[in-house]
Amino acid sequence: MSQLEEFYRGKKVLITGHTGFKGAWMCKVLLELGAVVSGYALNPPTNPNLFELCKLKERIHSHEGDIRDLDRLKEIFAMEQPEIVIHMAAQPLVRESYKEPVYTYDVNVMGTVNVLECVRLTDSVKSFVNVTTDKVYRNFEWERGYKEDDILNGFDPYSNSKSCSELVTSSYKNSFFGGESGKMDSGRFVAISTVRAGNVLGGGDFATDRIIPDCIRAVSASKPIVVRNPYSTRPYQHVLEPVCAYLTVAMEQLKDITKAGNYNIGPADEDCLNTGELVNLFCEKWNAIRPNEAVREDKPDGGPHEAGLLKLDSTKIRETFGIKGKWNMDEVMERIVEWNVSYLSGEDVNPVTEKQIREYIQKP
């Protein structure tokens, strides 16, 4: 039995944003670990979606609600009495943030305020993790990876709202949770961290403006894969890498509050591919199973500003918790193709999802 399994068995964990792509993977992992899972979110953001495909509503305490509704959120915290809270609810898309900046700030900033307020008012909570993004940093197009103490100042409304979410967390931590000590005036201890992950990939992502879902949609419609920014470099990683890292941070800081802090979660340098390389790898793996279906076509669309080069330095989380990437990009893409071939064949996706979770957890 892994450390995560020993720790999470029977633990009450509340996830905000549990109906999203990453949230649904988080639910599946926690169920595999034996946790008691509750979630608070709007309806799933896409149709189809992983949450419904895995029939998660039947397996967890799922509560529908807007993260901006503080009174409703307080009710759910009081009802569920969680020990651990993972805050993932967000408006997560850069391009959408240009269309809906006010909504993006409202969800990503005030949503964080509301969750932290509920953590403050709920005595059962001992560990809180705020999931932000690699895009919280002011982007200088550096070759080196960004470190946790670099300037927080995202460019676009999405990235900047997540920078603000980091600052909100820091303020609450210092104002109400005793700063680094984690000791509140009441004597209660709460460990608080933020985690900044790179771009996640995996089966069950059906979002717009994401490269792998675009690839799947293209091949299933017998169309070429249109690549709008082939030379933009991102810290791509399988969704299970950050999900299990979040759970490790939540576990370890509860055991030892001095480990609470801010952490980057990104892949090794050799796995920081540009979008063109990522699509080429997808085509190679897909065509190995379904020959000649995947074809790439570059077509810049003159869309709004997005960073060209973005890497994370994950030294801190590796040295603090021993966390390092388990799957290289070859292994990641093989599992994405495996999952989507199963899905497009009309199979129940629970077995392939659970198989991949077990493979990941059991790998040293």
Stretches found by the model and what they are:
Residues 32-35, 199, 219-364:
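C-terminal substrate-binding subdomain of Rossmann-fold SDR/epimerase-dehydratase oxidoreductases
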Residues 85, 207, 305-309:
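A generic short alpha-helical patch detector that favors 3-5-residue windows
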Residues 65, 203-204, 324:
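Histidine kinase transmitter module recognition
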Residues 1-197, 360:
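N-terminal Rossmann-like NAD(P)+-binding domain of SDR-like oxidoreductases, especially those catalyzing
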Residues 140-145, 149, 157-158, 163-254, ...:
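NAD(P)-dependent short-chain dehydrogenase/reductase
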Residues 13, 72, 103, 110, ...:
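Residue-level recognition of oxygen-bearing side chains
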Residues 68, 93, 104, 202, ...:
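Glycine-/small-residue-rich active-site loops that bind phosphorylated ligands and cofactors
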